[in-house]
Curated annotation (Swiss-Prot):
Residues 1-24 form the signal peptide. Expressed by the venom gland. Ion channel inhibitor. Keywords: Disulfide bond, Ion channel impairing toxin, Knottin, Secreted, Signal, Toxin. The presence of a 'disulfide through disulfide knot' structurally defines this protein as a knottin. It is found in: Secreted. InterPro entries: Huwentoxin-1, Huwentoxin_CS1. PROSITE patterns: HWTX_1 (PS60021). Belongs to the neurotoxin 10 (Hwtx-1) family. 51 (Hntx-8) subfamily. Hntx-8 sub-subfamily. This is U3-theraphotoxin-Hhn1c. Disulfide bonds join 54-67, 61-72, 66-79. Pfam families: Toxin_12. GO terms for molecular function: ion channel inhibitor activity; toxin activity.
Amino acid sequence: MVNMKASMFLTFAGLVLLFVVCHASESEEKEFPKEMLSSIFAVDDDFKQEERDCAGYMRECKEKLCCSGYVCSSRWKWCVLSAPWRR
């Protein structure tokens, strides 16, 4: 009976170790493409798009006005598409 408990414990510990090793190697593989893409598409601070003074689609419109083509929803207080059926 003791040998069976020990073998089950070792099997379980081995599976946990295998899971941890696989997860660690997978997370390293996922980091590589992110780093590569961020270095390729890095944008200089001078070329960053300036923030607009209006709120876009589904953005809060309490302090800011909605951008053109959007209206502030009276119920939800965020910018929605302007349409003829909207009030």
